[in-house]
Amino acid sequence: MSQVYSVAVVVGSLRKESYNRKVARALSELAPSSLALKIVEIGDLPLYNEDIEAEAPPETWKRFRDEIRRSDAVLFVTPEYNRSVPGCLKNAIDVGSRPYGQSAWSGKPTAVVSVSPGAIGGFGANHAVRQSLVFLDMPCMQMPEAYLGGAASLFEDSGKLNDKTRPFLQAFVDRFASWVKLNRAV
């Protein structure tokens, strides 16, 4: 029996029907049997504050960190707000990285998908997330890069991926499965 890797999917949009959440769901459906993708919610995480960490960390922080620690890999799916990372995603990254020296992210293979209505597909957010991941010691898949622009055009009226988008995301998630296997062995 082959290894099944658990992948925490962190979506940087809080909207229930955001394009990013739709792409995350589609990736879950397209994932090969070696990956089990699960969206980890970030909307209930209080803003990170080291004073609170020292006094009594919120249960939501503990639960989030535990979910990340239990995962074998992490997939970030993010929109772009003002050419950068949405505040909720940056907060989740910060919460998972603390207390200092006890990061839940360390060593976890990762990849970033950015989804935007704009033409450049969230390029700024994608790279801002990657910059944090380098510091957090997360081996990040470099290719294929995933900048999905024109988000409304990625889906059919039914909400499913269209025939133009599906092959790219299939290739992406297949490559990510190989990346996870390669980097979890290290």
From Swiss-Prot:
EC identifiers of the protein: 1.6.5.2, 1.6.-.-
TM annotation in the entry: none
Record text on cofactor binding: Binds 1 FMN per subunit.
Cofactor: FMN
Factors inducing expression: Induced by H(2)O(2). Induced by both chromate and the stationary phase.
Annotated keywords: Flavoprotein, FMN, NAD, NADP, Oxidoreductase
Catalysed transformations (reactions): a quinone + NADH + H(+) = a quinol + NAD(+); a quinone + NADPH + H(+) = a quinol + NADP(+); Cr(6+) + 2 NADH + O2 = Cr(3+) + superoxide + 2 NAD(+) + 2 H(+); Cr(6+) + 2 NADPH + O2 = Cr(3+) + superoxide + 2 NADP(+) + 2 H(+)
Residues engaged in binding FMN: 13-20, 80-83, 116
Any GO molecular function: FMN binding
Gene Ontology CC annotations of this record: cytosol
UniProt KW Acyltransferase keyword: no
Flavoprotein among keywords: yes
Domain of life: Bacteria
Matching InterPro entries: Flavoprotein-like_sf, FMN_Rdtase-like_dom, NAD(P)H-dep_reductase
Quaternary structure and partners: Homotetramer. Dimer of dimers. The tetrameric configuration has a central role in chromate reductase activity.
Biological role: Catalyzes the reduction of quinones. Acts by simultaneous two-electron transfer, avoiding formation of highly reactive semiquinone intermediates and producing quinols that promote tolerance of H(2)O(2). Quinone reduction is probably the primary biological role of ChrR. Can also reduce toxic chromate to insoluble and less toxic Cr(3+). Catalyzes the transfer of three electrons to Cr(6+) producing Cr(3+) and one electron to molecular oxygen. This reaction produces transiently a minimal amount of the toxic Cr(5+) species and reactive oxygen species (ROS).
Protein's recorded name: Quinone reductase
